Design a protein with these regions (language model features):
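Hydrophobic alpha-helical segments
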Residues: 1-134
């Protein structure tokens, strides 16, 4: 159970203390709230909009209805469109698909990493080249 101090913070941030807060186990309950407070609601390198889109994609990938509901509501508060939500979910799906293929095929990680570096270098060079310079 979270401390009284954390309960007061939660109420200040969310308007009330949601029932799921009592599911947080000791001794990490206050810390768990701190993660939500600092990562979800705090000022970080990512905007609230970016966090919401990432959250929707991850929630879909891990098939969590709780997370999906929360992050979609969060995204709506940031004026994320249906099209952007669909794209975030499709990107997460794409990552999950290729992860399954790569793991199931036991692709060599060192070879994959080297090939990825080559691909990135090629794309960066293409982007840096003046238009029409082939």
């Amino acid at each position: 159970m979270v401390s009284n101090h954390a309960r007061n913070e939660i109420e200040d941030h969310l308007g009330h203390v949601p029932s799921w807060i009592d599911s947080l186990a000791e001794p990490a309950s206050d810390h768990s709230w701190g993660l939500v407070r600092d990562l979800e609601f705090g000022e970080t390198e990512l905007t609230a909009r970016e966090k919401a889109l990432i959250g929707v994609g991850v929630a879909a990938a891990i098939k969590c209805p709780y997370c999906t509901d929360f992050h979609k509501a969060e995204a709506r508060m940031e004026d994320v469109t249906d099209e952007e939500l669909a794209e975030a979910v499709n990107l997460a799906s794409n990552t999950q698909y290729f992860s399954t293929v790569l793991h199931g095929s036991e692709v060599d990680i060192e070879e994959f990493t080297a090939e990825t570096a080559e691909i990135v270098e090629y794309i960066e060079n293409q982007r840096a080249a003046p238009a029409g310079a082939d």
